[in-house]
């Protein structure tokens, strides 16, 4: 079978988001997982920022991975991927000028779409919730991303977090990002369909939801009716790989019992050592957390 080009895959992604259906992403974190996802019939994959941090650095999701490290992983995936892959490009690795560089590099890597979020990063230790940048700065980042794009087939999605801001602010952000020219809007933290209806009113571009498996949003037909074209439940495949690796190596060492009771979440916490980063934040950033 002929290999699809990067532009072919970008056109495929645009066809998905122009349809009347909602598609669920495969967690794609390396070339092998990209091939598996395509072979199993997934229409779209996603390289998560948090997963890339785990895969490349064995580090927690504290915005520690650099653009070059993320792009290197995306490039490895782009060499073999035969399904469109979305890159979770976090905050674009800096200001609007950094966003432009991010878009250029990820486009060269072969990514079909990317998301730019309005989260204030790196992590603001010592705060109860994650802050967002101003809407004006978020709009500037989207405009910069569109300016930097060379292939018009690559999709640029703006992303915001509806869980930590009032509904009216979420509506305003979504509408302003749409007006700035974003090809789609990614929303994290939607509670239920009523919440989605409020925030998506007036949105005409495709929606992507990051649901983390929220059972209130499991009606795929209803999601599609409300304009959701891509749904990200999380990265279960990656965490299953962590668990399988641990159990296999543990068995090879003939440690008592062939299986461990530790969950993938517990293993991830153990081996990313987040307490070290919290301690460094206390020590060097005058943070009490």
Curated annotation (Swiss-Prot):
Mg(2+) binds at residue 88. Its cofactor is Mg(2+). Coiled coil: none annotated. Keywords: Decarboxylase, Lyase, Magnesium, Metal-binding. It catalyses: oxaloacetate + H(+) = pyruvate + CO2. Substrate binds at residues 50, 159, 235. Binds 1 Mg(2+) ion per subunit. GO terms for molecular function: magnesium ion binding; methylisocitrate lyase activity; oxaloacetate decarboxylase activity. Its EC number is 4.1.1.112. GO terms for biological process: oxaloacetate metabolic process; propionate catabolic process, 2-methylcitrate cycle; pyruvate biosynthetic process. HAMAP family: OadC. Catalyzes the decarboxylation of oxaloacetate into pyruvate. Seems to play a role in maintaining cellular concentrations of bicarbonate and pyruvate. PANTHER family: OXALOACETATE DECARBOXYLASE (PTHR42905:SF3), PHOSPHOENOLPYRUVATE CARBOXYLASE (PTHR42905). Belongs to the isocitrate lyase/PEP mutase superfamily. Oxaloacetate decarboxylase family. This is Oxaloacetate decarboxylase. The lineage of its organism: Bacteria, Pseudomonadati, Pseudomonadota, Gammaproteobacteria, Pseudomonadales.
């Amino acid at each position: 079978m002929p290999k699809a080009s990067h532009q072919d895959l970008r056109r495929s992604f645009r066809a998905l988001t122009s349809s009347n259906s909602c598609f669920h992403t495969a967690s794609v974190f390396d070339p092998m997982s990209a091939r598996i996802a395509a072979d199993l019939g997934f229409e779209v994959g996603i390289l998560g920022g948090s997963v890339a941090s785990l895969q490349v650095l064995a580090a927690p999701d504290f915005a520690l991975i650099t653009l070059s490290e993320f792009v290197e992983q995306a490039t490895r995936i782009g060499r073999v991927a035969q399904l469109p892959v979305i890159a979770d490009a976090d905050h674009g690795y800096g200001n609007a000028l950094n966003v432009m560089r991010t878009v250029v590099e990820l486009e060269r890597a072969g990514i079909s779409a990317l998301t730019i979020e309005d989260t204030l990063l790196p992590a603001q230790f010592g705060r109860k919730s994650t802050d967002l940048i101003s809407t004006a700065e978020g709009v500037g980042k989207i405009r910069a991303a569109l300016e930097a794009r060379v292939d018009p087939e690559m999709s640029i999605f703006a992303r915001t977090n509806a869980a930590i801001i009032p509904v009216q602010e979420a509506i305003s952000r979504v509408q302003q990002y749409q007006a700035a020219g974003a090809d789609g809007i990614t929303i994290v933290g939607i509670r239920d369909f009523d919440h989605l209806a409020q925030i998506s009113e007036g949105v005409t571009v495709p929606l992507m939801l990051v649901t983390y498996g929220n059972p209130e949003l499991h009606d795929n037909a209803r999601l599609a009716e409300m304009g959701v074209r891509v749904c990200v439940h999380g990265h279960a495949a990656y965490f299953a790989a962590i668990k399988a690796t641990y159990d296999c190596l543990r068995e090879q060492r003939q440690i008592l019992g062939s299986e461990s009771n530790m969950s993938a979440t517990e293993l991830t916490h153990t081996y990313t050592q987040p307490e070290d980063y919290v301690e460094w934040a206390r020590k060097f950033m005058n943070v009490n957390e």
